């Protein structure tokens, strides 16, 4: 076990910067696909439910990543004993999660709902793996496993029920928005110690 030192701080700051860049690009892409340069229709209103769903999951992920890195690696009062392998693991998992946001951002159009759902399902699966390993480390993130499982069940169930069928164009977007809105509220309530230490 190593103490927190300048090299660790530099590495965490580098990782957080890389994650921030990818997530900022994803947010920019999502906004660009909602607000277009078309004179006849600058706002793509049919994409609003998917954009809101994107924001509902984007904000808590971005905030929790920042808080987790600070509490786990930068704050000597809350940091567990430092192990380089966990820092590498966290960095890899967070970059993979950020990449999922970029894929989600490109699939806001209602006709691409399966791509959006797929990216959310991959994101939640990655987060379950990360949460399970982090929980075994002794860091309280257990509620996220349950929340991610609920999202997987609802979206996976919707995809399964929709196989071979044509759903009303906006229905999957509304299901997504409501599911992610409710699970985000639950996340903030159940994991408030990480979001607001």
Where on the chain are the PLM-derived regions?
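Helix-loop junctions on the outward
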Residues: 36, 61-88, 104-108
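Membrane-proximal helix-loop-helix units in multi-pass membrane proteins
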Residues: 84-152
């Amino acid at each position: 076990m190593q103490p927190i030192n300048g090299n660790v701080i530099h590495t965490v700051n580098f990782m957080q910067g890389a994650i921030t860049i990818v997530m900022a690009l994803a947010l920019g892409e999502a906004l660009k696909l909602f607000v277009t340069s078309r004179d006849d229709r600058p706002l793509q209103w049919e994409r609003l439910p998917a954009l809101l769903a994107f924001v509902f999951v984007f904000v808590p992920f971005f905030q929790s990543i920042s808080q987790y890195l600070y509490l786990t690696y930068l704050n000597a009062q809350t940091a567990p004993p430092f192990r380089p392998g966990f820092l590498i693991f966290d960095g890899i998992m967070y970059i993979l999660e950020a990449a999922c946001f970029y894929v989600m951002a490109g699939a806001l159009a209602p006709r691409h709902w399966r791509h959006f759902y797929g990216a959310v399902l991959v994101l939640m699966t990655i987060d379950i793996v990360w949460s399970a390993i982090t929980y075994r480390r002794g860091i309280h993130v257990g509620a996220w496993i349950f929340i991610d499982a609920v999202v997987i069940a609802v979206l996976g169930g919707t995809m399964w029920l929709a196989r071979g069928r044509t759903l009303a164009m906006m229905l999957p977007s509304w299901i997504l928005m409501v599911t992610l809105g409710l699970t985000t509220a639950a996340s903030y309530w159940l994991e408030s110690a990480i979001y607001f230490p």
